Amino acid sequence: MSPVPPTDVLVVEHAPQEGPYAIGTALEAAGLPVRTCRTWAGDPVPDTLGDAAALVLMGGPAAAYEDFSGRTAELALLRAALEVEVPVLGVCLGAQLLGEAAGGRSRPGSGPQIGWGEVRAAPAAHGDPLFAGVPEHLPVLHWHGDTMDLPAGATLLASCDRFPVQAFRLGGSAWGLQFHLEVDKAAVDAFAAAFPDEAATAPDLVASAPRNLAALAPHRDAVFARFAALVADRAERSATRTFFTPKAAKWEARFAADGPRYTAAVLQMGLRPGGRALDVGCGSGRALPALRAEVGAEGVVLGVELTPAMLTATAKEGRADLARLLMADACRLPLADGAVDGIFSAGLINHVPDPAAALREWARVSAPGGVLLLFHPSGRAERAARHGRPLDPDDPLAEENLRPALHAAGWSLDCYEDASLHFLARAVRVH
């Protein structure tokens, strides 16, 4: 099994006039299809993120602190996205729900805030992945009466006098906007038509829209273009984490019988006491005991894994003390050139987006003469038969594909075994 690359961005709408507008335009420009859940039309909120590359929650007339149809399901989606760091963007009600999902509290404000008004960029905005470059004072459209108390660890990005929380970030993947940065002229007209009594409290709402939108548009488009680029860049990572997170707790029990084969494979690396070993895509840490045994107490063992829940599983199995665990992308290792003497990787190379790039990166961090061991506890033919498909001639692990790919990356293949009970390829770093 392997993660399926995300195919779309899930947008949850709560009202017909509160669509994604400029957000949707940016996603489309980045080649990201949008799947819309229109709760206002009776669409059920999905039970899971599925293959979504990002989650966008729009505004609506409901209150985030009151129960409404779909609220529980939306909070569950938000918490799932936060856990696996799938990018999230919440607008107005969506921002308040995001805060609630992370442990904050939404509540009634001091009265409605409707119409055009400035927000002030907070100091943290200048270094934010989305808000960097936004001016200190930005004219935006307000249309809300509620506010929120931010959850612990949130970063404030924008505020105003009446409503101190106007934009915030959670971690490095989730943003909440209380104001309506997404609007264009069609959106302003739709809001005014849907809520005429509220619009009447801001007499210049529609008349001043062209002027305010002209000032807003460059920054609006830049923010959402950055969000779309971030989603596209992290799509594979999002797929991997979404796929493996719910499986992590039972991963070790499911494949416990494979342990001896992992140990036997590690012995083929020829590691020496005091050496430096790296397990890329370490999962629940099944190879870490054998790697530690080979390099001894004076050696170094590193375990790299992209899914946080897998590192939690490693600790649960009592293996966290055997290695230094790093959460990182296998193709962007946080290691110096020549940092390790041996690299072990099980069931990973044929699932990364760019196997050639992975082999080059692993060569970069390997010392001259270092060993790379690619392993799987079953052979290619057995796995293909298990999944009811023929052998793939384009499989990166096929010898006719793997040997030249290794050579191009600076490795020399010196052992290739594709048996029924294991796959093993051993290569040496040559240049």
Kindly give the residue locations of the regions a language model identified.
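Class I SAM-dependent methyltransferase SAM/SAH-binding core
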Residues: 278-332
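Pocket-forming structural segment of enzyme catalytic cores
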Residues: 102-186
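A short acidic, Gly/Pro-enriched loop at the edge of an enzyme's catalytic core
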Residues: 331-342
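A short SAM/SAH-binding and catalytic strip from SAM-dependent methyltransferases
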Residues: 342-354
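Flexible gly/pro-rich beta->alpha loop and the following alpha-helix that scaffold active-site loops
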Residues: 24-89
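Conserved class I S-adenosyl-L-methionine
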Residues: 235-273, 286-290, 310-313, 371-397
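A short glycine-rich, Lys/Arg-flanked "PGG" loop and its adjoining helix->strand segment in the class I
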Residues: 356-368
